[in-house]
């Protein structure tokens, strides 16, 4: 039974405002725009994902998006950077691949052999990603050596999109992930670090891609994990937090609910009050979503608010169904090969 008060005002979803907001963000040239160069490729993915989920992908010019992504190719590393002339990184590489997959399932733009004597871009991307895996199964984000479970998910997802995920990579990567499982039922960045909802998604999502979810069946790990996830719902607001004793944040509508969806336990939380919390985070005047009601909007929270609504009831909003493993529409991910021998 929902905890939504009977006199709660019904809040409508204003799609046109959010489409306008995203388009403006993707073409913005403010001071804040230049301060966030390091997130530009991620921001493009957030905007494109929100638009395609709302069935409004045509709001951005497809060729302009693809041209920008290819400007971010770093020929030195064989990967994508977050901005033209930035070094390649695993995070921006996944975002680039996700957007390219949305527009071109076959990734034909990566098959050009003319620009580099070192092979085509697809081959070089696979070499870059696989070269970041360490002996313990973890992945670095780039050559500078930072390691955490985000990069495991990012690498595994990228290789899946490239149809290059092998058993040898999956076996060691999944072993590292399970080392990051905590006594409280969550996952952390590295072994022994604090449990966090976003890290739970990266670990559960990676295990799903690698067909390794059965590793959670040992020693009641799945039961503990589901309990930890359901405890993230904060009353009376209905939103999720990322850790115990923290405020709810609309982005966890994705990180928590996607993990529960992968584990087939989405209905173990109150979806009605969660939906209401998400809708209260809208800026109904200018569009976009914020982390909490009344705060400043941004494209990151907008993307994951819309993705959360799709998980709750995509038909109600006229959205595309979203894949909880990849955070992309099912119509795109249904053709992915999650693991190859």
Swiss-Prot record:
<feature type="binding site">
    <location>
        <position position="301"/>
    </location>
    <ligand>
        <name>Zn(2+)</name>
    </ligand>
</feature>
<feature type="binding site">
    <location>
        <position position="251"/>
    </location>
    <ligand>
        <name>Zn(2+)</name>
    </ligand>
</feature>
<comment type="similarity">
    <text>Belongs to the protein prenyltransferase subunit beta family.</text>
</comment>
<dbReference type="GO" id="GO:0008270">
    <property type="term" value="F:zinc ion binding"/>
</dbReference>
<feature type="repeat" description="PFTB 5">
    <location>
        <begin position="223"/>
        <end position="264"/>
    </location>
</feature>
<dbReference type="GO" id="GO:0004663">
    <property type="term" value="F:Rab geranylgeranyltransferase activity"/>
</dbReference>
<protein>
    <recommendedName>
        <fullName>Geranylgeranyl transferase type-2 subunit beta</fullName>
        <ecNumber>2.5.1.60</ecNumber>
    </recommendedName>
</protein>
<feature type="binding site">
    <location>
        <begin position="196"/>
        <end position="198"/>
    </location>
    <ligand>
        <name>geranylgeranyl diphosphate</name>
    </ligand>
</feature>
<keyword id="KW-0677">Repeat</keyword>
<feature type="repeat" description="PFTB 2">
    <location>
        <begin position="62"/>
        <end position="104"/>
    </location>
</feature>
<feature type="repeat" description="PFTB 6">
    <location>
        <begin position="271"/>
        <end position="313"/>
    </location>
</feature>
<dbReference type="Pfam" id="PF00432">
    <property type="entry name" value="Prenyltrans"/>
</dbReference>
<comment type="subunit">
    <text>Heterodimer of an alpha and a beta subunit.</text>
</comment>
<dbReference type="GO" id="GO:0031267">
    <property type="term" value="F:small GTPase binding"/>
</dbReference>
<comment type="function">
    <text>Catalyzes the transfer of a geranyl-geranyl moiety from geranyl-geranyl pyrophosphate to proteins having the C-terminal -XCC or -XCXC, where both cysteines may become modified. Acts on YPT1 and SEC4.</text>
</comment>
<keyword id="KW-0862">Zinc</keyword>
<dbReference type="InterPro" id="IPR008930">
    <property type="entry name" value="Terpenoid_cyclase/PrenylTrfase"/>
</dbReference>
<keyword id="KW-0479">Metal-binding</keyword>
<dbReference type="GO" id="GO:0018344">
    <property type="term" value="P:protein geranylgeranylation"/>
</dbReference>
<feature type="repeat" description="PFTB 4">
    <location>
        <begin position="170"/>
        <end position="211"/>
    </location>
</feature>
<feature type="binding site">
    <location>
        <position position="249"/>
    </location>
    <ligand>
        <name>Zn(2+)</name>
    </ligand>
</feature>
<dbReference type="GO" id="GO:0005968">
    <property type="term" value="C:Rab-protein geranylgeranyltransferase complex"/>
</dbReference>
<feature type="repeat" description="PFTB 3">
    <location>
        <begin position="122"/>
        <end position="163"/>
    </location>
</feature>
<dbReference type="InterPro" id="IPR001330">
    <property type="entry name" value="Prenyltrans"/>
</dbReference>
<feature type="binding site">
    <location>
        <begin position="243"/>
        <end position="255"/>
    </location>
    <ligand>
        <name>geranylgeranyl diphosphate</name>
    </ligand>
</feature>
<feature type="repeat" description="PFTB 1">
    <location>
        <begin position="15"/>
        <end position="55"/>
    </location>
</feature>
<dbReference type="InterPro" id="IPR026873">
    <property type="entry name" value="Ptb1"/>
</dbReference>
<keyword id="KW-0808">Transferase</keyword>
<keyword id="KW-0637">Prenyltransferase</keyword>
<dbReference type="InterPro" id="IPR045089">
    <property type="entry name" value="PGGT1B-like"/>
</dbReference>
């Amino acid at each position: 039974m929902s905890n939504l008060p009977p006199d709660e005002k019904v809040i409508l979803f204003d799609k046109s405002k959010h489409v306008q907001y995203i388009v403006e963000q993707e073409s913005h040239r403010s001071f804040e725009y230049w301060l966030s160069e390091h997130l530009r490729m991620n921001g493009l993915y957030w905007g494109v994902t929100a638009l395609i989920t709302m069935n409004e992908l045509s709001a951005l010019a497809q060729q302009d998006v693809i041209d920008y992504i290819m400007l971010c190719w770093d020929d030195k590393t064989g990967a994508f950077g977050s901005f033209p002339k930035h070094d390649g990184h695993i995070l921006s590489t996944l975002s680039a691949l996700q957007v390219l997959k949305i527009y071109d399932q076959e990734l034909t733009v990566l098959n050009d052999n003319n620009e580099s004597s070192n092979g085509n871009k697809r081959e070089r991307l696979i070499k870059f990603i696989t070269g970041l895996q360490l002996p313990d199964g973890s992945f670095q984000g780039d050559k500078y050596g930072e390691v955490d479970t985000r990069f495991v998910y990012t690498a595994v997802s990228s290789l899946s999109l490239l149809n290059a995920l092998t058993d040898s990579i999956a076996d060691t990567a999944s072993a590292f992930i399970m080392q990051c499982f905590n006594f409280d039922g969550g996952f952390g960045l590295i072994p022994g670090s604090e449990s966090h909802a976003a890290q739970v998604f990266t670990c559960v999502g990676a295990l799903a891609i690698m067909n390794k979810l059965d590793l959670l069946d040992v020693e009641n790990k799945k039961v503990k994990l589901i309990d930890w996830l359901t405890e993230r719902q904060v009353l009376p607001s209905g939103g999720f937090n990322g850790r115990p004793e923290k405020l709810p944040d609309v982005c966890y509508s994705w990180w928590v609910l996607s993990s529960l969806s992968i584990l087939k336990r989405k209905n173990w939380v109150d979806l009605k009050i969660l939906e209401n919390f998400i809708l209260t985070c809208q800026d109904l005047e200018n569009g976009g979503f914020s982390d909490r009601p009344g705060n400043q909007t941004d494209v990151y929270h907008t993307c994951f608010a819309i993705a959360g609504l799709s998980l709750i009831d995509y038909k109600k909003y006229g959205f595309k169904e979203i894949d909880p493993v990849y955070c992309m529409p099912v119509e795109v991910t249904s053709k992915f090969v999650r693991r190859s021998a």
